[in-house]
């Protein structure tokens, strides 16, 4: 399985269960269906709706991912840092430049239609899945004036070091104008 499939398995199992419990405990009267109706533009709403309508991740599939696949990802990621004697990875935070919410949907990446949700989370998934610290920092504004970001990932347990690296980056990054936000 690729990292997107594993990420979706873990996320969707945990989100459907955890978010439902959280919303019920909050007592604010907002249910998962209400929330889904409000986040459809991101692509996440449609995916959550599918899960609620019977495509939920089974306990067996989740257990396999968390006990077998996740440790393999953790080991692979640890090897990258150790074998290359590096403290952090630096990468574009997303596969796509940011879009206005009204323009979200799907894009073609490497000849394959991909939801904006997957494209925007693809690069940050290895650390998230493996339990490594990850940091996303504004890098610049795109030609359309929207903020673009870079990501930093560190080895498990390097949270403070990674924050120090991010803070050092922000000190040397050119000052960025604030994006113009439409009301």
Go through the PLM ranges and name each one:
Residues 1-2, 97-100, 143-144, 160:
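Flexible loop/turn segments at secondary-structure boundaries
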Residues 1-9:
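Acidic helix-start/capping segments at beta-turn-to-alpha-helix junctions
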Residues 7, 99-120:
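Short, surface-exposed loop/helix-turn segments at secondary-structure junctions
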Residues 12-75, 92, 96, 136-146:
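Short helix-loop capping/hinge segments that flank enzyme active sites or metal/cofactor-binding pockets
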Residues 76-79, 114-138:
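Small-aliphatic-rich amphipathic alpha-helix that forms the alpha element of a beta-alpha
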Residues 84:
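Active-site charged/polar residues at nucleotide-handling catalytic sites that mediate phosphoryl
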Residues 87:
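Conserved acidic residues
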Residues 128-183:
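Structural helix-boundary/capping segments
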């Amino acid at each position: 399985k690729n990292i997107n499939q594993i990420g979706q398995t873990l996320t969707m199992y945990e989100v459907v269960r955890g978010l439902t419990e959280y919303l019920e405990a909050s007592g604010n009267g907002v249910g998962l269906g209400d929330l889904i109706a409000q986040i459809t533009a991101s692509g996440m709403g449609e995916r959550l709706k599918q899960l609620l309508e019977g495509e939920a991740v089974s306990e067996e599939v989740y257990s396999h991912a968390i006990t077998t696949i996740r440790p393999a990802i953790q080991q692979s990621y640890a090897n990258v840092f150790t074998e290359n004697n590096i403290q952090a990875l630096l990468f574009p935070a997303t596969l796509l430049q940011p879009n206005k919410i009204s323009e979200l949907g799907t894009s073609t990446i490497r000849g394959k239609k991909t939801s904006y949700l997957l494209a925007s989370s693809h690069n940050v998934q290895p650390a998230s899945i493996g339990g490594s610290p990850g940091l996303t920092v504004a890098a610049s504004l795109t030609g359309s004036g929207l903020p673009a970001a870079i990501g930093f990932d560190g080895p498990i347990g390097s949270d403070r070091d990674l924050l120090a690296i991010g803070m050092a980056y922000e000190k040397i990054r050119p000052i960025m104008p604030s994006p113009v936000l439409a009301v």
